[in-house]
């Protein structure tokens, strides 16, 4: 019994550390990426379709609302807030879903369809935004049905999609760095195709690995719960 309690305490400490790290990284990416879209003379960090006048407005809405989701999302997973301040937990959840994920996913679909990054990022971003919306809807329906276990699982899946915005930047830097030795030979000294390759790989990797990691985590969590119930 003592060993079991100690194991649970260690797991709880690791969980708090992981959530704190996710919160810090999320805030850092918001401070880095979002402000460029909130000034009058927007300096977009991605290509804009000049022939589509509503491309930039949808991109601004997507950046701002996704930033809200990244800022408030991690606080949904602090157990102390859920247990001791349930009203705050519910308010933060509503802000996350209604001011963050809902407008962020819908505007993101439009921005994805108009992307200049190529067909692979286009399809990947559209699928991400559809899943982002769908998982939020499932989480909302679960909590309305008072199925809190399913609500937590769908919220974790949803935030894994949200957090892809953080990992995309990390993987982009990594894929650029590993290709730099190929710049002069394979790419003929042209950095643009190197960046395009790195960006496509980062988009796919950030989304696929985040969602795969979360499914593995949830499956292991359910397995541990089943074993714990048998003990």
Regions found by a protein language model. Name each.
Residues 1-231:
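Alpha-helical membrane insertion/targeting regions
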């Amino acid at each position: 019994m003592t060993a079991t309690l100690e194991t649970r305490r260690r797991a709880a400490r690791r969980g708090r550390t992981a959530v704190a790290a996710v919160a810090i990284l999320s805030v850092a990416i918001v401070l880095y990426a979002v402000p460029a879209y909130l000034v009058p003379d927007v300096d977009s960090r991605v290509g804009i379709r000049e022939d589509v006048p509503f491309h930039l407005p949808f991109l601004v809405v997507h950046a701002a609302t996704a930033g809200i989701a990244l800022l408030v999302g991690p606080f949904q997973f602090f157990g102390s807030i859920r247990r001791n301040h349930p009203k705050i937990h519910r308010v933060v959840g509503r802000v996350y879903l209604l001011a963050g994920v809902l407008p962020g996913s819908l505007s993101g679909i439009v921005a994805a369809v108009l992307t200049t990054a190529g067909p692979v990022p286009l399809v990947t971003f559209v699928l991400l935004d559809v899943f982002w919306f769908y998982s939020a809807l499932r989480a909302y329906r679960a909590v309305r049905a008072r199925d809190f276990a399913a609500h937590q699982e769908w919220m974790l899946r949803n935030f894994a999609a949200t957090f892809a915005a953080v990992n995309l930047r990390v993987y982009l830097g990594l894929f650029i760095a590993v290709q730099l030795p190929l710049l002069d030979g394979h790419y003929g000294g042209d950095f643009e195709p190197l960046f395009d390759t790195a960006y496509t790989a980062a988009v796919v990797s950030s989304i696929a690995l985040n969602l795969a990691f979360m499914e593995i985590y949830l499956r292991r969590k359910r397995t541990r719960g089943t074993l714990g119930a048998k003990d």
